[in-house]
């Protein structure tokens, strides 16, 4: 049996080796195909701290945790001492002192995790951190389930043409995927409103209008328009939902131009009739539901890797 991946924390895809990615895909596929969860000889406690709204990621992580046999400790940010001014570090210090071994965290602050894993000798926080999404920075679990879904379809990444479409500058999904896909050999393109494109993307791919790209793409990755991150953005008012769909959305005309084996992806939640025509969300080329299903198994693989890295539950 191949040696399984061990990590101390899982906060970004940037520090994963290609071999690590392969191990995670293989392990997630093992779980998806009915493989048994590892036996734990000691109880492992996990808390999910979601400071931003979430359905898919939160529920998917909890499902993964329960399938692995972990004990989930409820945590509601709205009724926690965070509302009294307690810092994230002190919240985790408290949970750790009470016996929590792992925390999955979704937070609005970019790179929030750096102050939790880069500790000085006087700090006593000892807890595995899994990033459930940080601001517009990274979304490693979404990226990994996307990578798994693409691998299931094509068996490789080399030479694939992938276009990421939409609210690029506000998207942690775009950042994680562009970093990993290019490293794995895919050719990445960007599309959508030009004022949501940033020069930081230049080293990962090129921008072009969607209608110039659509026929040649293997993967079309649609992004949600993130209205909650547009506070003060005058450009958002330049178009209505109908106009956005006409200019940048996946409608029937664009769908019919796709290659025979092309797939469409979306991290969710979908704004139906905006990024994606309502009647096409579950069309044959759509992998939206598959992504959500794969998310549970990939998150099982990610959690298990951190458990092994920290020797939790007797795993090594």
Curated annotation (Swiss-Prot):
It catalyses: carbamoyl phosphate + L-aspartate = N-carbamoyl-L-aspartate + phosphate + H(+). L-aspartate binds at residues 84, 172, 224. Its EC number is 2.1.3.2. Carbamoyl phosphate binds at residues 56-57, 106, 139, 142, 268-269. InterPro entries: Asp/Orn_carbamoyltranf_P-bd, Asp/Orn_carbamoylTrfase, Asp/Orn_carbamoylTrfase_sf, Asp_carbamoyltransf, Asp_carbamoyltransf_Asp/Orn-bd. Pathway: Pyrimidine metabolism; UMP biosynthesis via de novo pathway; (S)-dihydroorotate from bicarbonate: step 2/3. It is an enzyme of class 2 (transferase). One of its GO terms (molecular function) is amino acid binding. One of its GO terms (biological process) is 'de novo' UMP biosynthetic process. It comes from the Bacteria. Keywords: Pyrimidine biosynthesis, Transferase. One of its GO terms (cellular component) is cytosol. Heterododecamer (2C3:3R2) of six catalytic PyrB chains organized as two trimers (C3), and six regulatory PyrI chains organized as three dimers (R2). Catalyzes the condensation of carbamoyl phosphate and aspartate to form carbamoyl aspartate and inorganic phosphate, the committed step in the de novo pyrimidine nucleotide biosynthesis pathway. Belongs to the aspartate/ornithine carbamoyltransferase superfamily. ATCase family. This is Aspartate carbamoyltransferase catalytic subunit.
